[in-house]
Design a protein with these regions (language model features):
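Class I S-adenosyl-L-methionine
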Residues: 16-19, 23, 67, 113
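Local sequence-structure signature of Cys/Sec-based thiol-disulfide redox active-site neighborhoods
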Residues: 2-21, 29-34
Length: 116
């Protein structure tokens, strides 16, 4: 069983840098390529609890999908936002690193050090 799970996009420099930090610390890492295998809305809610954040905190507001889906609408519920992110994983901020019941966003990549 892995000590850490990283929701990783290999095309993202911050995601690669975060994974490099984990590897240098000799951490056992499960890599989830979340663009290929997006988390369900329920899994996203669990991640948010571990992050101590709400859905709006992890939505990439600069993505075209954010504008096209009108996600700026403040009347959308957490469940609705999680469903949109699950269906459009490009909207999920990256990387997210989980260890046990805690998680961080690797922006900056050094944030992951707080999990050690």
């Amino acid at each position: 069983m892995s000590n850490f799970t990283i929701y990783h996009n290999p095309r993202c420099s911050k995601s690669r840098q975060t994974l490099e930090i984990l590897n240098k610390k000799n951490a056992q890492v499960e890599i989830v390529l979340y663009l290929e295998n997006p988390p369900s809305a329920k899994e996203l809610q669990s991640l948010l609890v571990k992050l101590g954040l709400c859905s709006r905190d992890i939505i990439r507001k600069g993505e075209d999908e954010y504008k096209h889906l009108n996600l700026k609408d403040n009347n959308l519920t957490e469940n609705e936002l999680n469903n949109f992110m699950s269906e459009n994983p490009k909207l999920i901020e990256r990387p997210i690193v989980v260890k046990g019941d805690k998680a961080v966003i690797g922006r900056p990549p050094e944030n992951v050090l707080s999990l050690f």
